[in-house]
Amino acid sequence: MTEFQDLTISNNFMFAAVMEDTENCRGLLEMVLEFPIARIEVSTEKSIIHHPQYHGVRLDVYAKGDDSARYNVEMQVRNKDNLPKRSRYYHSQIDMDIIAKGTDYKELPDTYVIFICDFDPFGFGKYKYTFDMICTETGEMLDDGARTIFLSTKGTNGSEVSEGLRKFLGYVAADIAASTEDFDDDYVRSLQKSVSRIKSDREMGERYMLLKELLSDERAEGINEGRTEGIAIGRVRGKAEFVIELLSELGEVSTEISDAIMAEKDPARLLAYLKAASKADSVEKFRKETGL
């Protein structure tokens, strides 16, 4: 893992820490969604930044708006080819969390899942890809209140998005040296100040070091049989996704392998995959070990 002082906003830990400032988070959401948001509440309940004792934690950003809308934002620096299914899962998790608290499904709020990608997830050269549910035959909107947005730092259609969004994505793509340059944008400047403040915070540095130790111990010791969630950068949604997270650190994971892992429902089999992934030094070795 990158040293604390060398982190940029594209790092999940740093991104989550910066976005815990409600003004930073609200500014991002308004820029991406292109409508005003009066007030938001950023959830830190399960964030390792505030609760480093947790395993199975989140390093994405979860926020609630004044109108009860829910927002989930995640930084992605590697193309794992599972983002569409991941977005579907995030929407369902938000809905289930709300329903579990007694809300009728008819009163479900609008949900927005946003991925900020340091790559082009679809290959069309867009800075922004927006997905809504529509009727295949008529093109009519379903209006189910769920929207998924993928941002890309590799966009080439500058005239189709705001200057602020382009500069923000340029900041996301910047390496440690370039990230301190002046992007001539007030919002980016506010993010740069937040990054500097976080890096000067000794407690935040200690929490990041603890995260490094947790991940290092997890890799070295393998997967404890009693653990069902695991930890990883970004939200890890159970054993199957943890296997894919581990494998992606070793190399490119084919759609065939990732689909087979996600389709596996046998807990014992998933545990075997986890153990194999934690010990493998390549995706090919994992494939041979598991027969996938």
Indicate where each model-derived feature is located.
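Elongated, amphipathic alpha-helical interaction scaffolds
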Residues: 1-292
